[in-house]
Amino acid sequence: MSSKTTATKENALSKQEIDGRLSKTALARLASYRADGMIHLTPIWFDWNGKVFRLTLGAGRIHLKNLARDPRVSILIDQDPRLEKGIGAGAWAIMCRGTATLSQDAKLIREVTHAVLVKALGSAEADQYTEPVMAEGRTIVTITPQDWLTWDYNKAD
């Protein structure tokens, strides 16, 4: 385990490692630009299909207004078990900058909303909550990755 620097060639994640972690992890942090140039940053559930991030946002979310004006976005997915298990437990992170597109396609909204809920809550709860969540009015945000920065402290040294 290394603490010399956050991201190095030696501790970077491979494409397969990125896909594996993104397929299992449900919580990310999404950053978009507000009109005044400041960052708007919130936790969010997501789906990863091996090529793009897919998010389902409720009507009125600030991110939707921000992304309609400026599609630049950053997303962070990480785990740091050192906080509970000590320094030897390591930590990993996946940071991605990309471009967001917004969709109001009803079929896509249902598909992505259900996929995000299954990943976060499991099938039974997803089946129970998909319709109530859909009733809120949703927009699908698809993030196409452009730049990645990854690390896994368990790979370092």
Can you say where each PLM-predicted feature lies in the sequence?
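Charged, gly/pro-rich active-site loop segments
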Residues: 2-13, 87-157
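Short, basic/aromatic recognition patches
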Residues: 3-29
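Amphipathic alpha-helical interface surfaces
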Residues: 18, 63, 109-113
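A generic structural signal for nonpolar/aromatic side chains embedded in well-ordered alpha-helices
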Residues: 22, 66-67, 116, 143
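Structured helix-beta-strand junction loops
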Residues: 24-25, 69-70, 136
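Short beta-strand segments
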Residues: 25-59, 65, 75-77
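Solvent-exposed residues in well-ordered beta-strands and their adjoining turns
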Residues: 49, 58, 78, 101-103, ...
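Helix-adjacent hinge/juxtasegments
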Residues: 56-92
